[in-house]
Amino acid sequence: MDVFKQSEVWFVIGSQNLYGPKTLQQVMDNAHQVVNSLNNEAGLPVKLVLKPLVTTPDEITALCREANYDTACIGIMTWLHTFSPAKMWIGGLSILNKPLLQFHTQFNAQIPWKTMDMDFMNLNHTAHGGREFGFIGARMRQQHSVITGHWQDKEAHQRIGQWMRVAAAKQESQQLKVARFGDNMREVAVTEGDKVAAQIQFGYSVNAYGIGDLVAVVDAVSKGDIDTLVEEYEATYRFTDAVKLNGDKRENLLDAARIELGMTRFLEQGGFKAFTTNFENLYGLKQLPGLAVQRLMQQGYGFGGEGDWKTAALLRILKVMGTGLKGGTSFMEDYTYNFQPGNDLVVGSHMLEVCPSIAKEEKPLLDVQHLGIGGKADPARLIFSTPAGPALNASLIDMGNRFRLLVNVVDTVEQPHPLPKLPVARAIWQAQPSLATAAEAWIIAGGAHHTVFSQAVGVDELRLYAEMHGIEFLLIDNDTTLPAFKNEIRWNEVYYQLNR
């Protein structure tokens, strides 16, 4: 999955005609060098496109209008090389609906102490122009990001790359379609929510489809296509004896392949990039989709169990953010605890649906075993563990008057003991700052039992995603204390009530 190839970020230099053509030409010459260097040496995920210098209100407004309607443009990155009077930007910024990044840099890294004169000062005063631009953003209450640092600095490169990933995720959010196969699990609260409010806030649409709509596509899958897919399984995974040729669960594997092909075709035909299932809505399917869901997640689809459309959408968005990064991202659920002094652990898993992108094993184990829920035939699934390393769990919840993005930083650990009787994929982690504080804070904040678990995407990206959408962001990490966390929730409640 490479969602960045067709995307671009516009690099825009603001100035004014007061400087004269010679200075403005020097500004553009410097801009060409900066953009070429960033594109070729900074490892950015999205290409920068240098736009013509803007020096008048009409030019700025025209450029912002063009950015809004250019589907390749996922955001604008500005550099105030000189001074650009910010009243000129009001018209353009008032209509801009793409993410905005102010790169507070300058062409020279160090001051030429022996030769610096006023001509040099007037040409290289980002320190001056950047503050003017920042004021108008603050005055207009417009969300925009600021990154300060020299354009050859590696930390600046990393932060620009993070911003690009989040800008791409926002673009994906605005065009995302989520399919719900069946409805919400009966009587479950947190997986519900206001889909209209979500579409207004994030842009993605959520629509339900009767399970019969999916079954019709599944039943139309040919035997030849099933055989071809099973050959792919055999090349990709380790098989238990039960699912090998002539094994007593081989037919279950063939049924799972049929379901995967049918689901894939349904999603592709509808342009869906995220979906949900529900074990209470399986009429016409021979088994709960497990293997199919796992493989679709690995291909970049978002997924939520029991009709959880918010988690499905969030998973797709994090898949986009994490494209090309080390580590995977999966649907997850806190399942059970290990209470032990000095070694409190959480086992995360689900009935079947954990994404192989987080697998430690090069070839996960493919098996068919009994599932005591759903009332269907034994489903196929991939079984694996997760490598040690930093990770996070994220949950998007509907608080009625706002959406809340809740994140807990965790440390994934190696599985300390074999689990010979647990036939599902899993991840094991230590929650920051401790299991007790993390669990209590999560529960107090109303965090869902479903999460998006990621070893690829970090806190900074999710905080920025929340800022871009104007939603609440709460973080549980090593710096969290419960009194301060509770106070933050109280203050946020007041802020969002007043800011409606």
Curated annotation (Swiss-Prot):
Pathway: Carbohydrate degradation; L-arabinose degradation via L-ribulose; D-xylulose 5-phosphate from L-arabinose (bacterial route): step 1/3. Its cofactor is Mn(2+). Gene3D superfamilies: 3.40.50.10940. One of its GO terms (molecular function) is manganese ion binding. One of its GO terms (cellular component) is cytosol. It holds the Pfam family AraA_N. Keywords: Arabinose catabolism, Carbohydrate metabolism, Isomerase, Manganese, Metal-binding. Mn(2+) binds at E306, E333, H350, H450. It catalyses: beta-L-arabinopyranose = L-ribulose. It comes from the Bacteria. Binds 1 Mn(2+) ion per subunit. GO terms for biological process: L-arabinose catabolic process to xylulose 5-phosphate. Its EC number is 5.3.1.4. Catalyzes the conversion of L-arabinose to L-ribulose. Belongs to the arabinose isomerase family. NCBIfam families: PRK02929.1 (NF002795). Homohexamer. HAMAP family: Arabinose_Isome. This is L-arabinose isomerase. It comes from Yersinia pestis bv. Antiqua (strain Nepal516). The lineage of its organism: Bacteria, Pseudomonadati, Pseudomonadota, Gammaproteobacteria, Enterobacterales. The gene is araA.
